[in-house]
């Protein structure tokens, strides 16, 4: 489909160019006669009017220069840090090149129509800001324009190049910083609208507790329960929150069959779940948190959370680093645009509650994507790599510093040093970006099989009777075997022996570790 679209676009554009239709509208084909560039005077009058508030824009430009410099440092250090992670990422989890392209329709994470809307706004804001700061510095704007490949993929403001060369360095830095700086402002505004206006108005549509995750091969998953279901009843007992769920589950026992009522995308459904043993689960996966009372208790294999906590974390993303990271990565969690299983959980209230639900969710999604793409455009353009804005800002900044530190140096020598530094930095940034794609494929980790296993000579016996335990059947390159016998005694070794002085039910826990301290846990129930 994409290939047919590509052929149709290129063929149609070249036909229109050959027939002279593009020239009539100040259009031309560039980059292999495949991309359409449109130059226009539209918008010049707006730029002229807005730029008359010279002092205001100069002060704003000063703030943007400082802000972009800080973002530049942060982004470069982030790329360096990400480069070091290549050795820890599984080869199978390598980033697809498509994920590095911020264009809707090509990047699978960015939805087409929300993406086009947000990208157009980001480009218009970015380029108009360049134009405004050009006029503030009395630099002529020759033209404005769009670069299109069926839909807009770029925009530009074309200042007079000769006048730009004669600008003071700080004024030119303001001009370049205006693009990413204005994108960050728009990102902040629409983040506020999304979080503090739209999401903050959400309230749970029904009482219940949200299924946050489902453990494979346990009762809930085997019965058909899935994440994002709202659990409303367990064994005919009403569940209003996570505390109710815990209290009800603590009254159940392993092997019990319970009825679970849920709302799935707003539709009521019933499930019968055979409960597993809670103690066994914790011994296998979280032995450090295991307590004796857990053994024999029912375990559904469902992690739950109150729905309002989900909405609160999105309404207040700055409350913690984890919330902010979750907020920015919503598209990768398949939570933006909001899916049906999310919208069914909440109802808009307050002033925005008068908006029809369908329009409310469209607005909320639009606000998020305008925030997200402006943030990405701003952060990317702040990178210290020509032809990005950050690269030009870095060049002027270094030139200014050399002028103060090495005032005796000739202008030609300064230019040579700056050009060399800028080239090295641009190549470094490009390498770091490409390394995110190819690095894990070259040096990433291979799949590792780790499966601890206990072979017990007997599982039932008398006090003082000797039990033998053998871990040689474990899968993996283990180097240490640590045993906990549940009575306060421990041992180390592939094969061990133990006897208990008192009767009771014990769980023997084996923690097997490899040379890199990766571990696998196994347990065995022993009756004395």
How should each PLM-predicted stretch be described?
Residues 112-156, 163-208, 366, 420-425:
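Internal alpha-helical transmembrane segments
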Residues 446-528:
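Extracellular/lumenal mature domains of secreted and surface-exposed proteins
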Residues 86-110, 264-379, 393-429, 437-446:
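Functional transmembrane alpha-helices
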Residues 20-22, 199-219, 443-449:
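Alpha-helical transmembrane signal-anchor/signal-peptide segments
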Residues 2-55, 73, 79-165, 373-402:
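Small-residue-rich helix-interface/hinge motifs
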Residues 43-60, 162-175, 408-414:
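Cytosolic juxtamembrane amphipathic/interface segments immediately preceding
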Residues 221-244:
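Conserved PDZ fold ligand-binding element
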